[in-house]
Amino acid sequence: MTSTTPFRYQGADGVPLAAFRWATSDPPRAILQLAHGAGEHAGRYREPLAPVLAAGFAVYAADHRGHGLTSGMSHLGDFGPGGAPACVADMAELSKLARAENPGLPLVLIGHSMGAMFAQAYLLEHSGLIDALVLSGTTGPGPRLPGGPNSIFPNPRTAYDWLSRDEAEVDKYIADPLCGIQFSEASMASFVALRSRELSVEALAGVKRGLPVYVFVGDEDPINRRLEGLEPLIAAYRGAGLSVTLKAYPGGRHEMLNETNREDVVRDLLAWLEAHT
């Protein structure tokens, strides 16, 4: 049975953040720290990660600034004056907390979508805090699809068909009042600026060499432009000495943990985690 422990912790600048600890065993075999995506919240991941929890991993998951229980309904989409860099710093503070509460256990950072891109920025300054990195629904820097993410799918049923082929999961996202939020202009600008150096040779020079990295995506994900956007990311990480495994699922869209083949996706993720912790 999964235990849920809600808590709050302070970011580096003192801002309180809402978070959860999920676990099925005490002590756990390893720690998984989750960074959720844009326009959603950490609570969406408890069910998809249930097999990982059952295998003995504990999960620490926080709602970013401008999201979920951290912001409340009145401030959704606004990172605040610290912008996107503050969100990355918050992740490092949560890593330190998870390590302090679980001394000696491996710590794996998993980020999805915006959370994966935050993780890519985190990597440049804080790779020493983690033992492995998992990126879901991510991409390297590059242009967005001019028609928006739904534009590659003919006759979409909803504005969010690009998330998953599973209509029930798309409908759950649409019905969730904490999902589908729009960013403030300042928050979006800070996010774009954050990504400007993530693949430079100089920026990657200080990253822990040999760090295991697992990237799993759908090959119909418009965020990575059907895998095109991943090529520079994978090349840069391998060039920096990281041990990268790429798993691309045929037909998969953006949220592979909520896709029609999610059982296979989670099984593959768990196998990789068990091999690297």
Each language-model region and where it sits:
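N-terminal cap/lid segment of alpha/beta-hydrolase-fold proteins
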Residues: 1-24
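Alpha/beta-hydrolase-fold enzymes
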Residues: 110-183
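Short beta-strand element of the alpha/beta-hydrolase
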Residues: 28-37
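Alpha/beta-hydrolase active-site loop
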Residues: 80-100
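Conserved alpha/beta-hydrolase
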Residues: 42-44, 49-75
